[in-house]
Amino acid sequence: MVTESAVSSKSSQLVTKDSITLTINGRRFKFSVGDGTGDVSPAETLTETLRKRLQMTGSKESCGVGACGCCAVIVNGDAVAACMTLTVELDGKNITTLEGLEDATKGLDPIQQAFIDEYAFQCGYCTPGIIMVAKALFMKKAQPTPDEIKEALAGNFCRCISHYTVLRALNKLAGNMNAELSTIVRANDLVEDPIPIAQELYPSPYASGHVCKRSLD
């Protein structure tokens, strides 16, 4: 586990600037660096800066060690774990968060719309991170293959088990209409030890068609 002290030790070796400038969703933000009131601490993570300073709460924090993907944002075209990225390391970088995807004139990003169309979420906590990782992939390749989509999302975990509909939404968006869903994800892939539950994916009556495992009784 990466502790605050470990991050602080790393950051103290990196920071030599009195201020940093970040471009977030097309807007420039300048912060002073230090330990004073209002300063960005050398140990402050991007998740903390986004959520606490800028009230951009799309990036979620769950594991805090870069293992779940909930906090993902895009930095200079690449998906990164915001909870493991020090804000002071991002001077001069371009950052895109979930809040920056929707276009004022065109509406939702195609990936966001695909998730809505396919009900590719349940509680929604992990959804922003999944969308941002998918966005980074689609920015690099407009029509990724099913395997490329799975590989890109390997670090994203959904505790509600909505992986099936996530993959379906992204494969449809990528034009992989002929991809067999059974080759994209199998029910047994979703849990290590599927105890007495139906070995089939059913629409959840509680989540407007979101996909989940459901007991036969």
Question: Could you tell me what each predicted segment is?
Answer:
Residues 1-217:
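Signature of N-terminal electron-transfer/Fe-S-associated modules in redox systems
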